[in-house]
């Protein structure tokens, strides 16, 4: 990457401050762009879901990995919970989705609670493991909530044997009353579901898989307590990427934790952070990290900069840290501060190999929280920062009440936030489509067919606030 006309900014820059200049291109189509990353994480799109309690869970991990990304489970989860999540994700199919499952005797109330755990919008009613009907939310309207789902389920739905080509599934669903096909095993038992859009995505995305062809998943460990023991347990549970995570990565305690984990030779990429300087990047890499997380304070739920004055504008931080890592043949992840697909593209242009996304994905069906509605009946999910009082209380549950109360005084994050869902595009896959479409287009404008070429060829300019505002669409006129 280079700056336009050799310009050297006199101050640090955020994503809003910069733009990418179009270049002569021989990349004819967005589908000619390879979004696979090159940092050993195994991602085939440059998207990593941040280790936030309100974002990263097993449903999110399954869905994102199927599209080529990676989810990092939070450090606060008990080892047993992580083990369960890893086993679940690695047992999932690479093409078809896990269904929301009901029995004939479940109630309409059960159905309305569970349907929105997945973006495909239906629940499968199964008896003795065999699908007998589908329930949509519309089927439950105007019905007593104690009504049995067998009385509202439709039996008019498409079925196909597992292994059916996704293109054929797409064709079967073209005139179907419900846009979901139910896939069955040879014995007639339920295998999963696939929508028309899912069938299309199966031909666009390449799942992020391990050496045994199973979906990938990562997990985080903090710098307190038995770091080595937990890291060892996470590796034994089968995680594919391990993250040593703390808000201030450039401290002695973090360096000691990295050295401790690196000495275990666990055989998985070791990510560590967070830092915002070349010096901090070098120290973490020299301690044993293979990838460094960059970002202090850019996240939507983070109040660190306003509380402490500490941090750095994210684009400049990524640019400097990526340059330092490259000299050691290592990599960085840009963590936080992305609000639009352009921000992801700019982080990649600056040299990040992956971009971590948190709050943006909190408002999706696949995030762990329950779907709620505001007084205007708009759907939303709650989110909070991982250094907030709410997160601190959850993290210190084993401490004495006095210690918990004392630690709760020192929070740096939003404890309650509402992340709205778009009812028509509420799935994380919709956001992944949105992001990767933007990044692919960026590559065609730059003349890059890979992410490495994007960084190599990108020419970045600095703009005014008015320049950034000019780029916003005006759907309602002016």
Curated annotation (Swiss-Prot):
The active site is at residue 302. GO terms for biological process: IMP salvage; purine ribonucleoside salvage. Pfam families: CBS, IMPDH. Its EC number is 1.7.1.7. Keywords: CBS domain, NADP, Oxidoreductase, Purine salvage, Repeat. NADP(+) binds at residues 245-247, 295-297. It comes from the Bacteria. Pathway: Purine metabolism; IMP biosynthesis via salvage pathway. One of its GO terms (cellular component) is cytosol. Residues 95-152, 153-211 form the CBS domain. InterPro entries: Aldolase_TIM (IPR013785), CBS_dom (IPR000644), CBS_dom_sf (IPR046342), GMP_reductase (IPR050139), GUAB1 (IPR005991), IMP_DH (IPR005990), IMP_DH_GMPRt (IPR001093). It catalyses: IMP + NH4(+) + NADP(+) = GMP + NADPH + 2 H(+). Its cofactor is a monovalent cation. GO terms for molecular function: GMP reductase activity; IMP dehydrogenase activity. PANTHER family: GMP REDUCTASE (PTHR43170:SF5). HAMAP family: GMPR_GuaB1. Involved in the purine-salvage pathway. Catalyzes the NADPH-dependent conversion of GMP to IMP. Belongs to the IMPDH/GMPR family. GuaB1 subfamily. This is GMP reductase. It comes from Mycobacterium leprae (strain TN).
């Amino acid at each position: 990457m280079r700056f336009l006309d050799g310009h050297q900014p006199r101050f640090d820059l955020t994503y809003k401050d910069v733009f990418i200049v179009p270049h002569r291109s021989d990349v004819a189509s967005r589908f000619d762009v390879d979004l696979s990353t090159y940092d050993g994480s195994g991602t085939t799109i440059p998207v990593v879901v941040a280790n936030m309690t309100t974002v990263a869970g097993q449903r999110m991990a399954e869905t994102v990995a199927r599209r080529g990304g990676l989810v990092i489970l939070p450090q606060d989860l008990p080892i047993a919970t992580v083990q369960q999540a890893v086993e679940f994700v690695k047992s999932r199919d690479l093409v078809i989705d896990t269904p929301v499952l009901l029995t004939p005797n479940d109630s309409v109330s059960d159905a309305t609670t569970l349907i929105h755990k997945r973006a495909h919008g239906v629940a499968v009613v199964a008896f003795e493991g065999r699908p007998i009907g589908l329930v949509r939310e519309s089927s439950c309207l105007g019905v007593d909530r104690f009504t049995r789902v067998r009385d509202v389920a439709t039996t008019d739905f498409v079925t196909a044997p597992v292994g059916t080509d996704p293109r054929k599934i797409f064709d079967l669903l073209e005139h179907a009353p419900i846009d979901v096909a139910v896939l069955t095993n040879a014995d007639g038992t339920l295998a999963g579901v696939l929508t028309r859009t899912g069938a299309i995505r199966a031909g666009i995305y390449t799942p992020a898989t391990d050496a045994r062809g199973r979906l990938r998943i990562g997990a985080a460990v903090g710098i307190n307590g038995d770091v080595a023991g937990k890291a060892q347990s996470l590796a034994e549970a089968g995680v594919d990427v391990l993250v040593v995570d703390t808000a201030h990565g450039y401290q002695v305690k973090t360096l000691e934790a990295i050295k401790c984990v690196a000495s275990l030779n666990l055989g998985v990429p070791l990510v560590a952070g967070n830092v915002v300087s070349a010096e901090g990047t070098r120290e973490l890499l020299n301690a044993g990290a293979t990838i460094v997380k960059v970002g202090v304070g850019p996240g939507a739920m983070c109040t660190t900069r306003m509380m402490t004055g500490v941090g750095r504008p994210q684009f400049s931080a990524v640019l400097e840290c990526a340059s330092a890592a490259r000299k050691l043949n290592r990599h960085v992840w840009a963590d936080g501060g992305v609000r639009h697909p352009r921000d992801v593209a700019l982080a990649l242009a600056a040299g990040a190999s992956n971009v971590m996304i948190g709050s943006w994905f909190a408002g999706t069906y696949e995030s762990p929280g329950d779907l709620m509605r505001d007084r205007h009946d708009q759907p939303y999910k709650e989110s909070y920062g991982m250094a907030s009082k709410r997160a601190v209380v959850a993290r210190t549950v084993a401490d004495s009440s006095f210690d918990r109360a004392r630690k709760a005084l020192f929070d740096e994050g939003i404890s309650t936030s509402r992340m709205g869902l778009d009812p028509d595009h509420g799935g994380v896959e919709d956001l992944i489509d949105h992001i990767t479409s933007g990044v692919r287009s960026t590559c065609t404008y730059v003349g890059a067919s890979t992410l490495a070429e994007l960084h190599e060829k990108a020419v970045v300019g600095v703009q005014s606030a008015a320049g950034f505002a000019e780029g916003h669409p005006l759907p309602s006129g002016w």
